[in-house]
């Protein structure tokens, strides 16, 4: 399974990369600092899943996920450590 990671925190990006890369059937095909970069990586590489932080600069994970779904690029999976109901409801739409 080919996976792209998008998070504005370098420690989170590297941690996720290390965990995912240790799994035999998973391959990290790209790492992005924001949603716009993640969308471009999905367009460039055949990707199965994009792990997206909800809150990022330039383009957040919710907007990136909408584009990925509209263009049928990959399956987005949104991640957050925030407990904000409004943000969660926006992501579920």
Per-segment meaning from a language model:
Residues 7, 53:
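Active-site residues of response regulator receiver
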Residues 25-33, 41:
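Short hydrophobic/Thr-rich beta-strand motif most characteristic of the beta2 strand and flanking loop
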Residues 48, 54-55:
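The short loop immediately C-terminal to the conserved phospho-acceptor aspartate in CheY-like receiver
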């Amino acid at each position: 399974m080919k996976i792209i990671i998008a998070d504005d925190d370098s420690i989170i990006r590297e941690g996720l990369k290390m965990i995912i890369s240790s799994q035999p059937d998973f391959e990290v095909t790209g790492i992005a600092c924001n949603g716009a970069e993640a969308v471009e990586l999905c367009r460039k590489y055949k990707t199965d899943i994009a792990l997206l932080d909800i809150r990022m600069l330039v383009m957040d994970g919710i907007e990136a996920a909408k584009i990925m779904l509209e263009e049928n690029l990959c399956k987005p999976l949104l991640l957050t450590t925030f407990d904000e109901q409004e943000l969660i409801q926006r992501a579920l739409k």
